[in-house]
């Protein structure tokens, strides 16, 4: 394999690696957006649950069993 062929092969591999890195970066950015949305949704659910516990009390409070 000549030096020119080796350089051409390396340039080709580099181009494919650049494309792969960009594709992986795009996926990572989208996943981060999804994680951020899920964190916001989870915070809202936790807040709502805390509000409901404040209004209705916890199910674990010393309530008598249902058969009483």
UniProtKB/Swiss-Prot annotation:
NCBIfam families: PRK00295.1
Organism: Pseudomonas fluorescens (strain Pf0-1)
Gene name for this UniProt entry: slyX
Domain of life: Bacteria
Database matches in Pfam families: SlyX
PANTHER family associated with the record: PROTEIN SLYX
Name this protein carries in UniProt: Protein SlyX homolog
Residue ranges that the Swiss-Prot or TrEMBL entry lists as coiled coil: none
InterPro entries: SlyX
Matching Gene3D superfamilies: 1.20.5.300
Family to which this protein belongs: Belongs to the SlyX family.
